Amino acid sequence: MDRYSLIHTKMPREFVLLQGTGCRWKKCTFCDYHEDASENPFLVNKAVLQQVTGQYGVLDIINSGSAMELDEETLQLIQEIVQEKQIHTLWFEAHYMYRKKLADFAQRFAPAQVKFRCGVETFDTALRDRWKKGIPSSVTPEDIARYFQGICLLFGTQGESKEHVLKDIEIARKHFEYFSLNAFCNNSTSEKQDASLIAWFTQEVYPQIKDDPRIEILLENTDLGVG
């Protein structure tokens, strides 16, 4: 598994996939990433973080869960790297349930600016509930944007519509400085890919949005070089 990538295109940065202590939510119907966990993830993470050079001053960290689920040794090493490599911007991912802990978490890495992305997946509350995302139906895009600067959107599962995909993109553009569009790839879960929907997106939507600097499009899980 590749866990380090240097991204030169949109939002140039170093991108690392660390191992967490286990996703605390672990209920999303489409996700099996939570299997990437161990009781001593620092053994994996130390080798990954030692590859960070600080080339762009931006470090993006994901861990198949939420940043708050990283072990303490790993968090301390990230703090050291921020200082040693002069990292001025850090990105982390977190579930919405951690929203009120983000500010305190960010203080650990001062003076770096810390930004967070949330795996919202969709703003369609019925679909979000079906996917068991754990974000209440009453939560609005404005609510999410109070805590998170970026989001991840998922598309291409059976039962979605073209209108739903376009609406999600429209909302994300309005409220967030960054978002990724992730095509669903069949995995070990019960969710199944809608190949025709992804083909439509690739042919008709992708050409219109591919140059937007705020949007990263992943047609495969490994398109950013990790996984």
Task: List each language-model region with its residue ranges.
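Canonical Radical SAM [4Fe-4S] cluster-binding loop centered on the CxxxCxxC motif
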Residues: 2-44
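N-terminal pre-core extensions flanking Radical SAM catalytic domains
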Residues: 3-7, 27-30, 214, 218-227
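Core AdoMet radical
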Residues: 33-47, 55-72, 82-100, 113-138, ...
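Short amphipathic alpha-helix with an adjacent loop that forms part of the alpha/beta core around
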Residues: 47-52, 104-107
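Distinct, well-ordered alpha-helical segments
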Residues: 70-79, 99-109, 162-165
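Short, conserved loop/helix-junction motifs that constitute active-site signature segments
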Residues: 83-86, 107-111, 145-146, 173-175
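Conserved C-terminal portion of the radical SAM core fold
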Residues: 137-193, 201-224
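A conserved mid-domain beta-alpha-beta active-site/ligand-binding segment of alpha/beta enzyme cores
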Residues: 196
